[in-house]
Regions:
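Short, low-complexity N-terminal intrinsically disordered segments enriched in polar/charged residues
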Residues: 1-34
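Hydrophobic alpha-helical core bundles mediating ligand binding, dimerization, or RNAP-core interactions
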Residues: 13-16, 20, 32, 51, ...
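A solvent-exposed, acidic/Ser-Thr-rich amphipathic alpha-helical stretch
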Residues: 25-29, 33-76
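Short, solvent-exposed loop/turn segments at secondary-structure boundaries
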Residues: 42-43, 81, 94-97
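Short, cysteine-centered beta-strand-loop-beta hairpins and adjacent loop/turn segments enriched
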Residues: 61-63, 88-99
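Short, surface-exposed coil-to-beta transition loops
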Residues: 66-68, 84, 98-105
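A short hydrophobic beta-strand element
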Residues: 77-89
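Short beta-strand edge/turn micro-motifs at domain boundaries
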Residues: 80, 100-123
Length: 123
């Protein structure tokens, strides 16, 4: 597994999770190719702005906080890596889990940048 590409995939994933929690997208932008392709079950879009818009839509309302549990990364070949994530959305007032989501993420790394991001609902 090319360590630099895997490192970039892991850095991107961590930055995206932090951005969902905090609203700070600068570290995400630094890892994106200008023409990054963002694929979700609803649509496919291209560009950094589209990627940030997609991550912004995932941010929980102010009454919730989100915690992530990440699975192991898998190499898919040709600069592609996959990871499954379980997100717990907790009420800030009580700390109780209100709902959870399972997602699978694939990222493609080209020239040290994320060139493609795909989110799927995990099986």
């Amino acid at each position: 597994m090319p360590a630099p590409d895997l490192d970039t995939a892991q850095q991107f994933h961590a930055a995206a999770e932090d951005a969902v929690r905090t609203g700070e997208f600068g570290p995400v932008v630094a890892l994106l190719a200008p023409d990054v392709e963002c694929v979700t079950p609803q649509h496919t879009r291209s560009g950094v702005d589209a990627m940030i818009e997609e991550l912004s839509r995932v941010r929980p309302p102010e009454t919730f906080e989100v915690e992530f549990e990440d699975g192991h990364w898998k190499e898919l070949g040709n600069g592609r890596y996959s990871c499954e994530t379980h997100a717990h959305f907790r009420l800030k007032v009580t700390g109780e889990v209100s709902y959870s989501r399972d997602r699978s993420f694939d990222v493609t790394i080209r020239e040290g940048k994320v060139s493609r991001y795909e989110m799927r609902f995990a099986d």
